[in-house]
């Protein structure tokens, strides 16, 4: 189902007026994350998180795909990345750029893992500078904080001027690569194994991974 942005912003106003749940989220962020945005901006992050969760409960949604830029910033003044991260940590998958197939993928892999671990939504971006089978998985910051190997930072994204992005490198180790996708009624599922490896620093939430056969994986994505 598709819900209008206005309903989300109205719910944000409502939860900010009520205060209690928003205050809890603000306190959680200050305890578990390095906050490098203004207090009023953090309040908006918290309000967005609470509002999205309320609407998910109201409409019986178990995952969310949000239109994260750029109309939203004109209304609430923040990127939704940190709010997405907080919900992902609670087991409500939230993906960016209204990626419905990404939301379905998140539900599938978390169900396959019996919801014991959180998934993270990433773009498959550039080759590793020193590893022929390496690739950078990165996004503006929607990854759950339990994925991070360090205390995540709420700050500013690389490509936008509004606050609310998250920065952290993910833990290294074995992981599953998955993507459910569709085109004109034809559906497919890409599955692969990879491991996190060391690589250059970058902005956002990121991890460098090594696939067993990069060329084979690329051919089937």
Where are these regions (language model features)?
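Accessory "access/gating" subregions that flank catalytic or transport cores
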Residues: 41, 45-73
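Charge-patterned, long linear interaction tracts outside catalytic cores
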Residues: 1, 62-71, 158-166, 176
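Active-site loops and adjacent core secondary-structure elements that bind or stabilize anionic groups
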Residues: 2, 28-53
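Glycine-rich phosphate/diphosphate-binding loop of Rossmann-like nucleotide-binding domains
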Residues: 4-27
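Short acidic, glycine/serine/threonine-rich loops at helix termini
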Residues: 12-17, 74-80, 131-136
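Conserved small/polar residues in nucleotide/adenosyl-binding loops
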Residues: 2-6, 215-220
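A short, gly/pro- and small-residue-rich
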Residues: 77-93
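C-terminal catalytic subdomain
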Residues: 91-208
């Amino acid at each position: 189902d598709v819900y209008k942005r206005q309903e989300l912003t109205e719910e944000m106003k409502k939860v900010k007026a009520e205060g209690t749940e928003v205050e809890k989220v603000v306190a959680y962020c200050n305890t578990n994350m390095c906050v490098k945005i203004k207090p009023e901006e953090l309040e908006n992050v918290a309000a967005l998180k609470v509002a999205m969760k309320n609407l998910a409960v109201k409409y019986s949604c178990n995952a969310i795909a949000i239109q994260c830029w750029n109309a939203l910033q004109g209304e609430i003044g923040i990127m939704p990345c940190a709010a997405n991260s907080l919900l992902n940590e609670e087991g409500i998958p939230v993906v960016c750029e209204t990626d419905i197939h990404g939301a379905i993928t998140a539900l599938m892999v978390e169900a396959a893992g019996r919801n014991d671990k959180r998934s993270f939504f990433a773009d498959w971006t550039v080759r590793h500078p020193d590893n022929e089978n390496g690739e950078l998985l990165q996004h503006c910051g929607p990854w759950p904080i339990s994925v991070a190997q360090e205390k995540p930072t709420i700050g500013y994204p690389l490509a936008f001027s509004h606050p609310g992005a998250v920065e952290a490198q993910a833990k290294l180790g074995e992981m599953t690569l998955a993507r459910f996708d569709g085109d004109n009624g034809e559906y497919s599922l890409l599955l692969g194994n990879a491991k996190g490896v060391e690589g250059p620093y970058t902005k956002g939430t990121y991890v460098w991974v090594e696939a067993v056969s990069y060329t084979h994986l690329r051919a089937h994505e």
